[in-house]
Amino acid sequence: MIAGSLLPYQIVGDAIPASLTGVVGDAARGRAIVVDRRLGACLLCHSGPFSEEKFQGNLAPDLWGVGSRWSTGQMRLRLVDAGRLNPDTIMPPYYRVEGLTRVSAAWRGTPILTAEQVEDVVAFLTTLRD
């Protein structure tokens, strides 16, 4: 469980089974977050079915088919804190504020994404099926 300003969640195995907000996110908003280089910044490392985006990453797995590879809860944990599954990951924890280093004073205590935004991205990623 997370304390403080973040909503609590429970990790079960390799997943966070329950929605952070109690509701399913909006896939259209989630897609917008994924392609927004100022917000999610996902395409700095990942590529995917985003033909309008000319510069996509090649450091991390392609997002195409992610909805077939992982459950909703598995995707949620990877967004919240991928480091729990792979301590060597370069993927930032999008919904964690404790134990981080090299965080600007202006951003300390603030997650990269809100709980609602995490749920929106999860909703979008579940649509990316093989």
Each language-model region and where it sits:
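Electrostatic cytochrome c docking/interface patches
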Residues: 6-37
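Gly/Gly-Pro-rich "capping" loops immediately C-terminal to redox-active cysteine motifs
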Residues: 24, 33-35, 43, 47-81, ...
